[in-house]
Swiss-Prot record:
Keywords: Cell membrane, Membrane, Transmembrane, Transmembrane helix. Pfam families: DUF2975. This is Uncharacterized membrane protein YoaS. GO terms for cellular component: plasma membrane. Its main location: membrane. It is found in: Cell membrane. The chain crosses the membrane at residues 7-27, 48-68, 95-115, 121-141. InterPro entries: DUF2975. The keyword Metal-binding does not apply. It is a multi-pass membrane protein.
Length: 160
């Protein structure tokens, strides 16, 4: 892969991270306040939602960082190394973590949708869960293929 492709992908990673950062800055406080309005009898719900949404952003940004590292390994011609396998494994774990967090939060999504009569809230939660699982499965497949390619490469290096 030429350097221009990896530069494009690195820019794409940054452009993926910026809107999520904007959502964390501007939308998360509004969602937390909105949840406090929906559930006035639960005083701490605002802070739980606030912390919960920020905690789910941590594995997202860690996965972006790992993808950035993976592209750097490709630039350095270290794509077929244990470092790349480890980066893919970390991306897989981050995607699974995001799915678990949002699956655990689905009852709150359901309650918010029920009170507000907006089923789109549930759909948003499901899209996040399934997109994260697709990324996890894709990363797992790539991890396995890369590990097999590394094994084949090391076997070929030994036979020469």
């Amino acid at each position: 892969m030429n350097r221009m492709s990896t530069i494009f992908l690195k820019i794409a990673l940054v452009l993926i991270g910026i809107p999520i950062l904007a959502l964390c800055i501007f939308l998360v406080p509004k969602v937390a306040n909105y949840s406090a309005e929906l559930f006035p009898n639960i005083a701490y719900i605002k802070y739980l939602v606030f912390i919960y949404l920020y905690v789910t952003a941590i594995p997202f940004y860690f996965a972006l960082y790992q993808a950035f590292k993976l592209l750097s390994y490709i630039d350095k011609n270290k794509a077929f190394s244990g470092l790349s396998v480890r980066a893919l494994k970390n991306i897989k774990y981050c995607a699974v973590t995001i799915s678990i967090f949002y699956a655990a939060g689905m009852p709150v999504f359901y309650l918010m949708a029920e009170i507000d009569d907006a089923p789109g809230i549930i759909v948003i939660g499901l899209v996040i869960i399934f997109a994260s699982m697709v990324i996890a499965v894709f990363a797992a497949v790539l991890q396995k293929l890369l590990k097999e390619a590394i094994d084949i490469k090391s076997e070929n290096d030994l036979t020469v």
